[in-house]
């Protein structure tokens, strides 16, 4: 039997994204939301859904906006006062993320999540950066605080979450012809038994 969990990531990215996620949650489409705590619209987004019955995760972000900790402490992932862009990560042939630095930022975002929400995240994961050091840093911080780490998969291989194999499909949202409905249909048609 196919089981699909549809997660809306990037709560906090902007007010427009926040309103879209709020609507999808309140219409019953989404019950799993990834929260970016480092953005200007973070608290706005949280306030829109804080009373909803939703699984809220810490969606750790190192490629858009300003970091939570001092940028001078994390030069491998910042450019000036902002994070390096996702384009810089994608175009690099090597992992330039320094593990010790990214752990500082991951920890800071975890603490900011607790400050804003007053609770632990229901799960812990990262925002679409294919960096082994970023993923390792997420695992280290998750283990340090006994958090449910949901992992990241960029090649279609399943990740283990709560002893359950989960297949992730983000679709290619940067494509000029991206169609979320078509992506959803393809995702369902290609889904394997178990969680997708």
Predicted regions and their residues:
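Non-cysteine beta-strand/loop elements that form the S-adenosyl-L-methionine
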Residues: 55-62, 79-85, 196
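Active-site gating loops and adjacent loop-to-helix segments of metal-dependent hydrolytic enzymes
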Residues: 67-97
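Active-site beta->alpha N-cap acidic-glycine motif
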Residues: 2-65
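Active-site mouth loops of central-metabolism enzymes
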Residues: 3-14, 91-103
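Short, acidic/polar
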Residues: 14-22, 102-112
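Catalytic domains of cell-wall/extracellular-matrix polysaccharide-remodeling enzymes
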Residues: 107-167, 171-182, 189
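Hydrophobic faces of well-ordered beta-strands that scaffold small-molecule active sites
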Residues: 4-9, 31-35, 56-58, 122-124, ...
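Acidic (Asp/Glu)-rich catalytic clusters
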Residues: 21-27, 43-55, 72-81, 114-117, ...
